[in-house]
Amino acid sequence: MRIVTRPDFDGIVCAVLLYEALDISQPVKWVEPNAVQRGLVEIRKGDIIANLPYDDRCSFWFDHHYTNRIYRSFKGVFKIAPSAAGVIYEHYKDRFKRDYSELVTATDRIDSADLSLDEVLHPEKHGYVMLSMTVVNGGEPDEPYWEKLIGLLRQYDLQRILDDPEVKQRRRHVIEQNDKYTVYLKKNTRLDKHVSITDFRNLENIPAGNRFLVYSLFPESVVNMRIRYETKNKEMIAVSIGHSIFNRCCNVNAGLLLADFGGGGHRGAASTRFESSKADTYLPQIIDALKKNKNNEN
């Protein structure tokens, strides 16, 4: 039996809960959603997929993404919910020896972007928000740290985890990176009507930073679109869309929109990856749909 999940905070908490609820000894297999969608991941019998698209080779599946819904029978639970961790917690709640309710509630808020302006601008004052920002998704693989966090969350309370020397160092780094990221966002983001478009393709090193900062910097925008090269050889482009968490007037289901371009996700946040040769066709279409701001769920 093996856990297969994605390397974000929700995925890490999914792993914590599955390790606690089930008899699992194998290490986590960390993968990105797009790799599952493209059939690039080796999935085998006994695997438990969490927070990722369904693969019919797995034995159990837990997810909450709008565009990942399937209409055939499977073992596990699919539910539109704030987090996949919350889906797992509800399913196995009678098996836990520790009280994970606070962790799951925090994960729900973080993964669904249900955050206050103070939490976005001053994450260092909010423990779980800060801890989640030490997990950098989409950067270089960081498996030892992801595995370490799983162990810490299974054993200790939040303050003990925040005081861990490595976590402490990463917290300091997050604050430094957020300051730099603010500068990058201002330089590389433009407004097209109510759409803020952040284009990092001109940068050799993609900056890491608080994904919610852009909403505080461009309050008139209802949705942000971020563009970057996925690979160093610039053959693939990654696009992510997020509804503003402070100006909630975006009518476009982001997951459904990007499903038309090989991606998917939630109503309020989604991503896709495609060949750079398709950028001149795909990007204007995506931007046009966001500018029209029409409900695309019907």
Spell out what each predicted region is:
Residues 112-195:
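Hydrophobic, aromatic-enriched interface-forming segments
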